From Swiss-Prot:
Protein name, as recorded: Complement C1q subcomponent subunit B
Biased segments, Low complexity type: 80-92
Principal place of residence: secreted
Biased composition (Gly residues): 96-105
Protein encoded by which gene: C1QB
Domain notes: The C1q domain is the ligand-recognition domain, which specifically recognizes and binds the Fc regions of IgG or IgM immunoglobulins. The collagen-like domain interacts with C1R and C1S proenzymes.
Domain Collagen-like: 37-86, 60-114
Post-translation changes: Hydroxylated on lysine and proline residues. Hydroxylated lysine residues can be glycosylated. Human C1Q contains up to 68.3 hydroxylysine-galactosylglucose residues and up to 2.5 hydroxylysine-galactose per molecule. Total percentage hydroxylysine residues glycosylated is 86.4%.
Amino acid sequence: MMMKIPWGSIPVLMLLLLLGLIDISQAQLSCTGPPAIPGIPGIPGTPGPDGQPGTPGIKGEKGLPGLAGDHGEFGEKGDPGIPGNPGKVGPKGPMGPKGGPGAPGAPGPKGESGDYKATQKIAFSATRTINVPLRRDQTIRFDHVITNMNNNYEPRSGKFTCKVPGLYYFTYHASSRGNLCVNLMRGRERAQKVVTFCDYAYNTFQVTTGGMVLKLEQGENVFLQATDKNSLLGMEGANSIFSGFLLFPDMEA
């Protein structure tokens, strides 16, 4: 059976309870003596489990370089690499020794047919060894042949006969003692005078020369003809010579 406490007595009861607690604490203090000597440390306990990893620390400063290590052994040969780009052209080297003859090349294509006239070589030179007086209009015969390619000059007649039409050059050098005039003649059966060369001297040795380019047709003759001034000489030390040669053949003939 609960006991009813009047509301007016509650403060008194609280005061009495507080005073009782104070007395109890003072009684406990009065029973406490001086501190004792610390005892011997106990045996270390069993290590506890590892703790959780801590947070990463701040990056430290760079350390000093280490000592150089020993050279390692050579590894196996690797695969060839990709070819690099071509380098720059180097300087020109010295000329090498002369090589041997190469193999003969293949024959070239057949050429076009040529004109036989383009390959003709026609030339003559003849001297006069006959030292006898000449008559007017007489053909001057140069009887000693020096050169006569293709035999277009006839020493027995003293005439050149054209066999290949074209341009020819004729010249003469005549030694004489006194006045000398000669005619350069051309034609077939009836020759015509082309030009007359003259040189005048009285009782003295001289050399007369002359030359001309003529366009000849096949069968025409060319020769020198004497005039009334015909002191021509033909002897050792005073030679007279008649020459001629083909310059260009007539390709249209």
